[in-house]
């Protein structure tokens, strides 16, 4: 199967790179339909990273998924990536590559690479991280406090 057959945006076939440029852009609203193992977790966590790089505060992000397992995988992936990107001695080129994989244009990736390296520390300093929950968290919300 070619990239063009596997990825669609706005009803037309696009390359993998074009798809991730669109899908990982936090300024866009997207719907992703894909089978298990197709990379939805990668894409959703990439959107979170991109939103943080665009200036969103960690406590302003709420990711909702269907299962505890998926929520746990998303939390683990985000933590793993942030630690990896903050690792001392990680080459600047690797940070640029990671950003480009997530749809950031080359010139912008060069500029954002140092910010990506500092993202883990920024989240720790914020005190409250990104909320990644299951949709069940919405069911336990009460319209008013109990007496």
Regions found by a protein language model. Give the residues of each.
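P-loop NTPase Walker
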Residues: 2-142
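A short, hydrophobic C-terminal helix/tail in secreted or cell-surface proteins
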Residues: 143-147
């Amino acid at each position: 199967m070619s990239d063009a057959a596997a990825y669609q945006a706005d009803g037309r076939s696009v390359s993998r790179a074009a798809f991730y440029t669109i899908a990982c852009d936090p300024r866009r609203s997207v719907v992703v339909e894909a089978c298990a193992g197709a990379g939805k977790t990668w894409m959703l966590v990439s959107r979170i990273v991109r939103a943080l790089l665009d200036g969103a505060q960690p406590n302003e992000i709420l990711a909702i998924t269907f299962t505890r397992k998926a929520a746990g995988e998303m939390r683990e992936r985000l933590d793993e990536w942030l630690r990896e990107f903050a690792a001392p001695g990680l080459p600047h080129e690797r940070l640029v590559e990671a950003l480009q994989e997530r749809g950031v244009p080359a010139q912008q990736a060069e500029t954002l690479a140092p910010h990506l390296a500092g993202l883990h520390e920024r989240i720790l300093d914020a005190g409250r991280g990104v909320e990644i929950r299951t949709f069940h968290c919405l069911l336990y919300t009460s319209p008013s406090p109990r007496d």
